[in-house]
């Protein structure tokens, strides 16, 4: 949760930065100004990241639309963010929204081995001064690939793309404090019981082990970086 909240907040702030010419953008200020129409922000996914991105965007006076697929969450978002438009996913609706948006922000995780939800053709039809920010990674937007903090953006189909996987590294002090609050109980469990017993007793901790003895043991991490994965098991901790 805390990393999603930080990533969602930073995603909107980065969109603002990369709309400016000194960062390779088109020279667009994503801010509501007197006498000018408010820029449009389309957020795919209404979880913790999407909610925080929407809060930043609404604070800037932007027109915000959130696309969510679960009716319960749609109702929650409409209650929490009355100034935002929250819609259920429908291909024709989403594609039309994308063609008119200034900032497209993806927070949806892809299902492995499933086709991209947003094709290259859809991206090609976007406004040429738009910005795409993807805080998740590959698999949702066809033209998206991972970037780094040292080289965060690229142009594809005339649209600026940003896909930094470790965005919370931009604010390490805040991220460390937030992560410690969330991970503290797990750290204490490992210190008290040892890693093997702690993992055996807590499925969430077991599923969170990413690397061990120089090997990637988490399938999603390996897949995202095109590296081999050694499936994790408790016997590896003997």
Predicted regions and their residues:
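Adenosine-phosphate binding glycine-rich loop
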Residues: 1-14, 18-30, 139-238
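Electropositive phosphate-/nucleotide-binding environments in soluble metabolic enzymes
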Residues: 2-9, 47, 51, 67, ...
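Generic hydrophobic/aromatic pocket-lining and core-packing "Φ" positions
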Residues: 12, 53-54, 74, 123, ...
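Glycine-rich phosphate/diphosphate-binding loop of Rossmann-like nucleotide-binding domains
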Residues: 24-108
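Residue-level "edge-of-site" marker
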Residues: 70, 111, 167
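Rossmann-like adenosine-cofactor binding region
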Residues: 79-158
């Amino acid at each position: 949760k805390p990393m999603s909240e930080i990533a969602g907040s930073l995603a909107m702030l980065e969109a603002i930065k990369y709309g400016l010419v000194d960062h390779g953008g088109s020279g667009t200020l994503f801010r509501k100004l007197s006498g000018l129409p408010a820029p449009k922000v389309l957020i795919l996914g209404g979880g913790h990241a999407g909610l925080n991105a929407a809060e930043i965007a609404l604070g800037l006076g932007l027109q915000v639309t959130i696309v969510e697929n679960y009716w319960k969450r749609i109702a929650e978002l409409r209650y929490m963010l009355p100034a935002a438009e929250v819609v259920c996913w429908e291909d024709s609706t989403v594609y039309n929204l994308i063609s008119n948006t200034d900032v497209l922000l993806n927070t949806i995780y892809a299902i492995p081995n499933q086709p991209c939800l947003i094709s290259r053709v859809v991206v090609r039809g976007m406004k040429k001064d738009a910005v795409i920010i993807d805080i998740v990674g590959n698999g949702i937007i066809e033209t998206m690939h991972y970037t780094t903090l040292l080289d965060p953006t690229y142009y594809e189909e005339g649209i600026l793309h940003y896909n930094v996987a470790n965005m919370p590294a931009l604010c390490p002090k805040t991220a460390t404090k937030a992560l410690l609050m969330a991970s503290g109980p797990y750290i204490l469990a490992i210190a008290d019981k040892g890693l093997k017993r702690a993992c055996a007793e807590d499925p969430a901790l077991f599923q969170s082990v990413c690397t061990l003895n120089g090997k990637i043991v988490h399938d999603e991490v390996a897949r995202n970086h095109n590296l081999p994965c050694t499936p994790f098991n408790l016997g590896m901790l003997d």
